[in-house]
Amino acid sequence: MQNPQNLIWIDLEMTGLDPDRDVIIEMATIVTDSDLNTLAEGPVIAIHQPEEILAGMDEWNTRQHGQSGLTQRVRESTVSMAEAEAQTLAFLEQWVPKRSSPICGNSICQDRRFLYRHMPRLEGYFHYRNLDVSTLKELAARWAPQVRESFKKGNTHLALDDIRESIAELRHYRDHFIKL
């Protein structure tokens, strides 16, 4: 059910860091309520890319996405960028009105840059604000290093795992860093 207080969490895996050269190869979304309770998990989509795009990945992306199995899932996928965008929008429209949720995640500005370039309808669905967990991570590193160090991430670099970790990390900072 649509609620303007719900939060949209998104994570993208890309072939690199430059939205003008690189492309999205996986995306996932989760909708939470304002207390960070998961309401629904959206589609987890490996986006097909031609072999020449995959061959152009740098060493880190080639190793990481190869080891995680994502590269093979991308090869086997039949879902285009436009289809992935449409599936994700159809899911979000069930839970959150357009332009009511900030885009939520870790280092979310990078994901937003790729959405702006490759999935503009999806990027336009979000409010212009960002809820970026990495802001709290950076503040904790400077003001309360023990709080930052006490949260350990799995670093699988798979979209759904990364979102779940971002939500858990924000809960951690809410419980141990932010005085409510």
UniProtKB/Swiss-Prot annotation:
<feature type="domain" description="Exonuclease">
    <location>
        <begin position="7"/>
        <end position="170"/>
    </location>
</feature>
<dbReference type="InterPro" id="IPR013520">
    <property type="entry name" value="Exonuclease_RNaseT/DNA_pol3"/>
</dbReference>
<dbReference type="GO" id="GO:0000175">
    <property type="term" value="F:3'-5'-RNA exonuclease activity"/>
</dbReference>
<dbReference type="GO" id="GO:0005737">
    <property type="term" value="C:cytoplasm"/>
</dbReference>
<keyword id="KW-0963">Cytoplasm</keyword>
<comment type="similarity">
    <text>Belongs to the oligoribonuclease family.</text>
</comment>
<dbReference type="InterPro" id="IPR012337">
    <property type="entry name" value="RNaseH-like_sf"/>
</dbReference>
<protein>
    <recommendedName>
        <fullName>Oligoribonuclease</fullName>
        <ecNumber>3.1.15.-</ecNumber>
    </recommendedName>
</protein>
<dbReference type="Pfam" id="PF00929">
    <property type="entry name" value="RNase_T"/>
</dbReference>
<dbReference type="GO" id="GO:0006259">
    <property type="term" value="P:DNA metabolic process"/>
</dbReference>
<feature type="active site">
    <location>
        <position position="128"/>
    </location>
</feature>
<dbReference type="InterPro" id="IPR036397">
    <property type="entry name" value="RNaseH_sf"/>
</dbReference>
<keyword id="KW-0378">Hydrolase</keyword>
<dbReference type="GO" id="GO:0003676">
    <property type="term" value="F:nucleic acid binding"/>
</dbReference>
<comment type="function">
    <text>3'-to-5' exoribonuclease specific for small oligoribonucleotides.</text>
</comment>
<dbReference type="InterPro" id="IPR022894">
    <property type="entry name" value="Oligoribonuclease"/>
</dbReference>
<keyword id="KW-0269">Exonuclease</keyword>
<keyword id="KW-0540">Nuclease</keyword>
